[in-house]
Each structure stands twice: as C-alpha cells, then as structure tokens.
Amino acid sequence: MARLLSELAGLLGLELRGEDRAIEGVNTLEAAGPAEVSFLANPKYTHLLANTRAGAVIVTAEHADAVPCALVSTNPYFDFGRTLALFSKPQGSLSGVSDMAFVHPEAELGEGCTVYPFAFIGPRARIGAGSVLFPGVYVGEDCRVGAGCLLYPNAVLMAGTEIGNGCILHAGVVLGADGFGFARTDFGIQKIPQVGTVRLGNDVEVGANTAIDRSVLGVTTVGDSTKIDNLVQIGHNVEMGRNCLIVSQVGISGSTKVGDDVTMAGQVGVAGHLSIGNGVTLGPKSGVAKSIPDGETMGGAPAVDKATYMRTLTVMPKLPDMYKRIGKLEKELEELKKLAAKE
C-alpha cells in the first residue's frame, strides 16, 4: 500500500524536507527507485547519496541537504526499521487454532491466538492474547507464554518455561532443556537432575537454534529487551540482565551472572560462576576466565582490556619476523661471547 511522505513523517515524528510524493516500499541506497525510501546510518556510505534514485532518504540533519528529499531523523537506522515495519507483511497466512494442532483441554489460550497445524500445547500451559505458534512448536506442561509472542517453526518450550510479552523465538530455539550437570563417580558419570526452569522477560528475541538450559534449582533468567542471535548456548542457572546483545555462537557457562546492557560479539566464551558487570563489551572470540567489573571493554583469549588487546593485534603479524630477528641476534651474541672468551 502506497503512503505519502507527509503521512510517513507524521507517523514517525520526522521532519520532511522536500517534495511530497507517494512511497510504495523501502530499499537500499543503490537499489531504491523514486517510489521507495532508503536510509543512511553509517557515514562510510555517505558517498552513495550523490547517485541514489530513492524518492526520499532517512538521514540526520547533517546530511539532509545532500539529497533532494529527506526525512530528518536523530536515529536513521531505528526509523528505517519503523518504516520497514509499515510496508512489510508479517510471515504466515493463517488465523485461529488449527484442528490439526494439539491443545490440551487444561491449556488456556488468550483471545486472538493463532496456532498452526502440528503445534503441541500441553496441560496447564497458558498462551497470551494475540500470540502466534507456527507448525511444530512444542509448549510443555505448565509453560507461560505472554501476549503478542511469535514462536516460529519447531521452537520448543520444555515444561515450566516462562516467556514474557512480545517475545520472538526463531526456528529451532530450545528453552528449558536439561542443563549440563553430571557427577564423576567410581561407577561412571552420573546425571544430576535439572529441576529448575527458564524465564524470559518482555520483548526478548532469541535466534534460530539457540539453547537456554533449565537450572539445576531455581531459574535461568534473561532480562527484558535482551536480543540473542543464532546458535548461542546459555547454560543452567545463568542470570542475564536487560538490554543485552548476544551475537552468534556465544557460549555462557552455568551460574554466570551477566549485567544489564552487555554486548558479546561472535564466538565469545564465558567460563562458569563468573560475574560480568553492567555495560561490558566483549570483542569477537574473547575467552573470559575471570569476572569483569562494570563498563569494561575487553577482547582476546584470555580476555584483556581493550588497549592491551589492540596492541596485541598490532604485534601479532610481526611475530614471525621478530622471531627471525631474535634468532639472528642470539647467534650474534653467541659469537661475541666466544670472541670475548678468547680475549
């Protein structure tokens, strides 16, 4: 559905600079046509403004004069996302509860829920109003799913798992599988029962094939508005705060506490029973073996402060040459020692 730029500006609370026109969609600066909106969030792409054919560009005031028609924003990337939502069509075409889904008689479904074929909702589970469960979703007994949640195909909530309002679970997510708890004995490795639960706050998004394990006792928790990427492993009894960004292939071992506003880049590994403070940033492939106070930026394995990590990155490519030079110096030193001994 086409919308006038003036309408978009009003809906988004942005300033329109330029001629009003109908807009039919959203695209990149390179590909956008006269009936599409684009955006500039990263300054390194500023050069693309000169040749874009976009009907309008969402930009900061600094770049508004670089295009014939601008929607002026203090956060172009965020407002691009809001614009995209206005033009995009949500996935799925069904509504209501399919006859081919299994809904236990003791389960409770809120108003306006959609449950696709082959979903399973167990006894005493409660599904909030307007939530959508795609095919293959498993919601075990005593689970709680908040209002307005999206559970994509084959998402699994094991017994007792709770998620808040507005959560998104992508395909293959598993919440509440047993934590990795075992004891070595004289008669083999024995399983420690995992009898706790998992609880997600409101507006949490969990990427495809991520696993968040149930606690041994108590609750494994993820705070409001935290976003977790694909293929992440969160161990039993982890307590994660609000507004965290956890990128793909991160592994967080059991009983670690993660504060609010923490960012972990791809493939970070965190040992168990640690404390990661508020506002901590961990660079890609960081290996965290000790607790980190609030506000630190760290990288490397083992993780060190940012300044040390950056110096290490600078030195590492030079190591082969340095090794040769040191070897040469050692030989020269030995020759000098021999000469000195003869004197």
Curated annotation (Swiss-Prot):
GO (cellular component) term, any one: membrane
Catalytic residue list: H236 (proton acceptor)
Protein's name in the database: UDP-3-O-acylglucosamine N-acyltransferase
Pathway: Bacterial outer membrane biogenesis; LPS lipid A biosynthesis
Species of provenance: Nitratidesulfovibrio vulgaris (strain DSM 19637 / Miyazaki F) (Desulfovibrio vulgaris)
GO molecular function: N-acyltransferase activity
Catalytic activity: a UDP-3-O-[(3R)-3-hydroxyacyl]-alpha-D-glucosamine + a (3R)-hydroxyacyl-[ACP] = a UDP-2-N,3-O-bis[(3R)-3-hydroxyacyl]-alpha-D-glucosamine + holo-[ACP] + H(+)
Keywords: Acyltransferase, Lipid A biosynthesis, Lipid biosynthesis, Lipid metabolism, Repeat, Transferase
InterPro entries: Hexapep, LpxD, Trimer_LpxA-like_sf, UDP_GlcNAc_AcTrfase_non-rep
Cross-referenced HAMAP family: LpxD
One Pfam family recorded for the sequence: LpxD
EC main group: transferase
EC number(s) stated in the UniProt entry for this protein: 2.3.1.191
Family: Belongs to the transferase hexapeptide repeat family. LpxD subfamily.
GO biological process: lipid A biosynthetic process
Biological function: Catalyzes the N-acylation of UDP-3-O-acylglucosamine using 3-hydroxyacyl-ACP as the acyl donor. Is involved in the biosynthesis of lipid A, a phosphorylated glycolipid that anchors the lipopolysaccharide to the outer membrane of the cell.
Subunit (UniProt): Homotrimer.
PANTHER family reported for this sequence: UDP-3-O-ACYLGLUCOSAMINE N-ACYLTRANSFERASE (PTHR43378), UDP-3-O-ACYLGLUCOSAMINE N-ACYLTRANSFERASE 1, MITOCHONDRIAL-RELATED (PTHR43378:SF2)
